[in-house]
Amino acid sequence: MQSTQDYIEMRLPASAEYVSLIRLTLSGVFSRAGASYDDIEDSKIAVSEAVTNAVKHAYKKNSEIGMINLCFEIFDDRIKIVISDQGESFDYEATKSHLGPYNDNENIDFLREGGLGLFLIESLMDEVTVYKESGVTISMIKYIKKEQVRNNGERVEIS
């Protein structure tokens, strides 16, 4: 396993007004690491979805605003983003299977609300893992060298 080149950590209130700050920070981190414009934009959307989910769902039963922890681990070939909260947890696999995939032939007028964030995050990032102990932690990886992005489900090795 490669060692981390840089590690950046943020701790912010679980409030929607901080999403733009997180997006701005992500842009700077990814630009500094040499990521492409498309990778930056995809990652901004995925991280915004994950943070918005934490803001909307993690602390909904608590009158106080909780905290969100966010960290970026920069490697030579990838950036790992970890977002965690200490709020309400959920069963990721059950939620995914309950919502099910969206089909191209579904009428957009009857498209169900909610759950798009999970599918969006998984489609925009190269690897996504959700842990649900003491809140929810979402780990996302974006490979920043195109040669290492998955090809038909298989990782392309560079010699």
From Swiss-Prot:
Tell me which positions the record assigns to the signal sequence: none
Give UniProt keywords alphabetically.
ATP-binding, Kinase, Nucleotide-binding, Serine/threonine-protein kinase, Transferase
Q: Which reaction does it catalyse?
A: L-seryl-[protein] + ATP = O-phospho-L-seryl-[protein] + ADP + H(+); L-threonyl-[protein] + ATP = O-phospho-L-threonyl-[protein] + ADP + H(+)
Q: What is its EC number?
A: 2.7.11.1
- Major enzyme class: transferase
What are the coiled-coil residue ranges?
none
Q: Which GO terms describe its molecular function?
A: ATP binding; protein serine kinase activity; protein serine/threonine kinase activity; sigma factor antagonist activity
Tell me which family the UniProt entry assigns to this protein: Belongs to the anti-sigma-factor family.
Q: What does this protein do?
A: Negative regulator of sigma-B activity. Phosphorylates and inactivates its specific antagonist protein, RsbV. Upon phosphorylation of RsbV, RsbW is released and binds to sigma-B, thereby blocking its ability to form an RNA polymerase holoenzyme (E-sigma-B).
What HAMAP family does this protein map onto? Anti_sigma_B
Please identify the protein, giving its name as recorded.
Serine-protein kinase RsbW
| Organism, as annotated | Staphylococcus epidermidis (strain ATCC 35984 / DSM 28319 / BCRC 17069 / CCUG 31568 / BM 3577 / RP62A)
